[in-house]
Amino acid sequence: MSARQDEDQRLQAQTQAQAQVQAQAPLSLYRERLKIANACQSCRASKVKCDGGRPVCARCQKRGRACSYSQHDAASPRGRGRQRAKAPTRQPRPIRSRASVELPVTAPTPVTAQASPLIAQDYSLQTPSATQTPSTTGFSGSSDLEHVHEDRDESRAFYAAHGRFAGEVSSTIDKMAGLSPDTTCSLVPFVDAPLFGDVGEPPRNVVLDFASDLPRAYADRLLAIYWHHVHPVEPVLDQQQFCRTYDAFYSGSGTPLHVDRDIWLSTLNIVFALAVQIQESIPMQKRDDEANRYFQRAWALLRPEAILWKPGSLELVQCLLLMNRYLHCTNNQQKTSMAATLAIRIAQNMVCHTSEESPSSDADKDLRHKVWASCVALERPALLTGHGSDFHAWELELHEIGTHIQLAQVQSKNSMATKLGLPRLYQQDEYHAIAVQLDGCLNKWEKSLPDDWRLQNMHMIHDRRARAERYLLHFRLLHSRIYLHRPMLARLYAIKSHAPTAAAASDPSTISDRLLQECARMCLEAAQKLTSLIAEIHDPNEPIGILPWWYRVYYLHIAGIHFLAAMFASDLFTPSVERAWYQVLAALRAHEHLSLYVQQCARTFETLAARILNARCLSVNGNGIMALDDGAPGLFLDDMFQDVNFDLDEFLFSVDDTGRRTNY
């Protein structure tokens, strides 16, 4: 008996010793973030690459800026590995990591199992682990969020102009609050915000042939929702031709010989996914699970690794276009850009953008033009292409103006261009005059609209499709105005933040100063109108809104970010702007049931506003202008406006970016 007790004590001692060793052993670390850990405070705030040179990095030395490192960085120049936090008690997470999502295989409706279903191979939606970027909109300090942003430069390779603007606003607010940069995550709709939840990887045994799985009545209902609510704003498909193939497929005769079965089934699944997502009355978790399951089927059926080896077809372009639209509402940025690039290149090879090769009929020619218009719209995900011919003409005109606005803000100077002596398309000091001309073009275009297309006469239109087209056109107009005047809004803060004394601020204002002030106000006025228009079209009692809810969230985010920027100066954050700000918050709260991202976006906005208005984080001079600390960068100072010549080189795009997807 004593021997057994001794043995038990010995085993217990060994167990305790092993437990102590495991407790002392370091937890598994994420890969070293060399770029982020070595970055100086200035480069960290601007979210740009830094070589970590000491005492001055190359970027700061080139621009003559003060270069400083935090004490923690100095103590650990090789970067600090972050330990994986202990898993908390299972609770609903704000936005789950894609790697941890378990997606059910069962369908949302009662199904009948097939005797020998077609089984998909493992076509992964995920990028390699080195580039994975789990998304969230919460704040640092939560155990779920400690490994969110491993490398923002890599994860936002296709960063939109609005996304960069939002990132700079939140970064500056964090700096003013005495927090490290990127304390507040600023995911942006149509860039990296998971509006549709986590798509995740398709199950290994996903059933692809679901003709008998999905009841015909339920499939008819989803298809009807798509034609009535999604197709008017995304006229990618030919309704008559698609319905003929759909009837043949469900009747048992199969798809026609000229139709690629896998591509058509992939398109049908994306149609179902969009039809499910647009239904605002379905609970969020159920809607995401069902829609993402359809999307996973579509991805597996398309077999993306085989697209490059297949001959191009109009059906393939249509499938890629719809897939791109769905991916825009996920955090699969690489897949989004890949789908867009493939669609555009295949359409170009098929000569969809010219009439050199005449199609067999006028209907085919019209369809090709619609598909090409959708390809053009891929450059800006909020560019919704309407269904009517009149709308199509006006939309193309507005798109042309928007293209020139973008060109006026693109950096056309780089090292190679300077070496070759190439002229710049737009000089930096010309943007004021160019903006006036472009604003006149927008006004002229707006005045050319017929009376029944004007915003004040919208209540007279009873046809839902016609109203949707008209509303979308006005959303695009307001967005273009915001985009046009946003650089002047940023420039205004740069000038005020650099004012050395109160006496300098009291000097008589010049014409340029007044122009900047007025353009900033016009930018905020457009954001106010955008907010009011969303409130006008949103009816919480409607199961499906006249505008898809993800577009409403996108425009609310645009308006909210600009209102946050207005809080930096009391002369711009007027009572009317303040009312519009609270209207944005109320509208986001009304959309919280649609996506976890919307819930945390509202909380992020409130937190950022509280930091701006907190007396501990700012000081106000005699003119009501927020004076930033000497060590803190202005809203868009060093990296965006280097001098009084209105340098846009670091603000919106670089030449390399223009080859990618450049959104507003």
UniProtKB/Swiss-Prot annotation:
GO cellular component: nucleus
Location of the region described as Disordered in the Swiss-Prot/TrEMBL record: 68-102
Function statement: Transcription factor that acts in concert with sor4 which is a transcriptional activator of the gene cluster that mediates the biosynthesis of sorbicillinoids, a diverse group of yellow secondary metabolites that restrict growth of competing pathogenic fungi but not of bacteria. Regulates the cluster genes in a light dependent manner. Also plays a direct or indirect role in regulation of paracelsin biosynthesis and cellulase gene expression.
Full protein name: Sorbicillinoid biosynthetic cluster transcription factor sor3
Keyword DNA repair carried by entry: no
DNA-binding region: 40-67
Pfam family, any one: Zn_clus
Annotated knockout phenotype: Decreases the production of trichodimerol in light and darkness. Also impacts production of paracelsin in a light dependent manner, with increased paracelsin levels in light. Also results in increased cbh1 transcript levels and correspondingly increased specific cellulase activity.
GO molecular function: DNA-binding transcription factor activity, RNA polymerase II-specific; RNA polymerase II cis-regulatory region sequence-specific DNA binding; zinc ion binding
Record's subcellular location: Nucleus
GO biological process terms, semicolon-separated: DNA-templated transcription; positive regulation of transcription from RNA polymerase II promoter by galactose
Induction line: The promoter contains putative CRE1 binding motifs 5'-SYGGRG-3' and expression is differentially regulated in light and darkness by CRE1. Photoreceptors BLR1 and BLR2 negatively regulate the expression, while ENV1 exerts positive regulation.
Keywords: DNA-binding, Metal-binding, Nucleus, Transcription, Transcription regulation, Zinc
PANTHER family (UniProt xref): REGULATORY PROTEIN GAL4
InterPro entries recorded: Fungal_SecMet_Regulators, Transcription_factor_dom_fun, Zn2-C6_fun-type_DNA-bd_sf, Zn2Cys6_DnaBD
Predominant localisation class: nucleus
Native species: Hypocrea jecorina (strain QM6a) (Trichoderma reesei)
